[in-house]
């Protein structure tokens, strides 16, 4: 049995890690940290995991990184906090999955420009943890940068077309997310009276997930791309629905496109291709699946692909566990083989 620590256990991603790991037969959670809630019972804060595993016996702890001695550490901390923690854990040889944006960019200047933070803890060996594209690199690394929620759904929706050089350099992503993607701390934007029965766009050209999407697709296609991304906030708790648009470079049919997607993802359990029906938020709610469908081509050669993920699972904690399974040599599906909560 491998041991796990969760640094930052009071947010939504920490909560989801606890829920999902309760079904994992190969690991045991020993430490869950929180400076603010230190000394309080874990299940008083997270009643949804009461009576599961050893959780009734755990209290939040305020542990320094140098005092952590588990096999695996999930850093479920805000952007900017992980870079102060991860280098110490890395030096100790601990397997790390960081759910913040701190290690998603090899180009530190790009990170600093988009996140507005000075990066102080670069680790050259950190690997971008999108298993469908980087599985072999993940296997060889001990520090994994878990992808962002929006980038996960966006990249997977267009990866087969980019990899096969079937679309031109213009790719547009329109994504709509549930409110939990904004984090556990409420704001004017996410306050119930403001978000309920409403739909709004935000950071329409300058969201920090834009360069993350772009760099991964450019790496895959080995060419420069003009990636545009606009997010929207939905009055729902979970889920991201992404509509991706680009223009085909050659005359291919919808059947051809579907075959390309099925071939590209033929060994990917967590990617489901919908030939006829459309992906939905309820179909992936609570799961680690990315559902992809649409594949419609209009009279101008514009192709439209739709993807759906749960932003807290495949977009965060579930993908983090998938990455842990890979680096630890576990079955990749361990702890993650559940269907969507539909309706």
Swiss-Prot record:
- Where do the catalytic residues lie? 149
Q: Does the keyword Protein transport apply?
A: no
Give the GO molecular function terms.
Answer: N-acetyl-gamma-glutamyl-phosphate reductase activity; NAD binding; NADP+ binding
**Sorted alphabetically, which SUPFAM superfamilies does this protein's record hold?**
Glyceraldehyde-3-phosphate dehydrogenase-like, C-terminal domain, NAD(P)-binding Rossmann-fold domains
Checking PROSITE patterns in the record gives: ARGC (PS01224)
Q: Where in the cell does this protein reside? A: Cytoplasm
User: Which keywords does UniProt give here?
Assistant: Amino-acid biosynthesis, Arginine biosynthesis, Cytoplasm, NADP, Oxidoreductase
Q: Which InterPro entries match?
A: AGPR_AS, AGPR_type-1, NAD(P)-bd_dom_sf, NAGSA_dehydrogenase, Semialdehyde_DH_NAD-bd
- Cited NCBIfam families: argC
| Protein name as annotated | N-acetyl-gamma-glutamyl-phosphate reductase
Native organism: Methanococcus maripaludis (strain C5 / ATCC BAA-1333)
Q: Which gene encodes it?
A: argC
């Amino acid at each position: 049995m491998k041991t796990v620590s969760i640094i930052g256990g009071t947010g939504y991603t920490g909560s989801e890690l606890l829920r999902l790991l309760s079904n994992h037969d190969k690991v045991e959670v020993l430490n869950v940290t929180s400076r603010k809630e230190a000394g309080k019972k874990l299940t008083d804060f997270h009643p949804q995991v009461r009576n599961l595993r050893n959780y009734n016996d755990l209290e939040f702890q305020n542990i320094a990184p140098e005092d952590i001695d588990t096999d695996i550490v999930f850093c479920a901390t805000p952007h900017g906090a992980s870079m102060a923690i991860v280098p110490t854990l890395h030096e100790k040889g601990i397997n790390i999955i960081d759910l913040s944006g701190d290690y998603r960019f090899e180009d530190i200047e790009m990170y600093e420009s988009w996140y507005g933070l000075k990066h102080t803890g670069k680790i050259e060996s950190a690997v971008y943890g999108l298993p469908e594209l980087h599985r072999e690199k993940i296997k060889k690394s001990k520090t994994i940068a878990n992808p962002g929620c929006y980038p996960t759904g966006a990249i997977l929706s267009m990866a087969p077309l980019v990899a096969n050089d079937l679309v031109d350099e213009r790719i547009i992503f329109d994504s709509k997310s549930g409110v939990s993607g904004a984090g556990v701390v409420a704001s004017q934007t996410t306050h119930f009276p403001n978000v309920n029965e409403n739909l709004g766009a935000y950071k329409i050209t300058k969201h920090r997930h834009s360069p993350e999407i772009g760099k991964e697709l450019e790496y895959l296609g080995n060419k420069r791309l003009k990636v545009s991304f606009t997010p929207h906030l939905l009055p729902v708790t979970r889920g991201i629905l992404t509509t991706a648009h680009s223009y085909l470079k050659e005359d291919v049919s919808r059947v051809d496109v579907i075959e390309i997607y099925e071939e590209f993802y033929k060994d990917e359990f967590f990617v489901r291709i919908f030939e006829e029906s459309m992906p939905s938020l309820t179909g992936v709610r609570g799961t680690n699946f990315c559902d992809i469908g649409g594949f419609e081509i209009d009279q101008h050669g514009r192709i439209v692909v739709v993807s759906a993920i749960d932003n807290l699972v495949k977009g965060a904690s579930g993908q983090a566990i998938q990455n842990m399974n890979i680096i630890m040599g576990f079955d990749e599906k361990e702890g993650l083989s559940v269907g969507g909560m539909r309706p």
